[in-house]
Amino acid sequence: MKFPKIYYVLLLSFLLGAERGAELRTRERVLYGKFEARFKPTQGEGLVSSFFIYNDDFPNSDWNEIDIEILGRFPQVVDLNAMSPGSHLRTHYVPFNIHLDYYEYGFEWTPDYVAWFI
């Protein structure tokens, strides 16, 4: 799976009512690499914790994104996605409550594949 150059963006979480989060941008474009973050996902209805990179040139080019998303209402579900035209979202189940502790999340992006890890 090949993606155009992207900006590195990190969004940690939104807290209901307080809407707090973080985003990190670079002026440099990156293409391939290993991306990691250590965080404790937010738990609760309507909350999302995520770690992702995406192409910031939309709509001038196709939307491309690699992400890890954790919905606060599902304690054992993680969405690991490589989104581009024609791609699909992937839901994965883990054998533990993901909201109870800090874990290291990441993905390795190469010219040939994207691999995720927790």
Briefly describe each language-model feature range.
Residues 4-14:
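Sec-dependent N-terminal signal peptides
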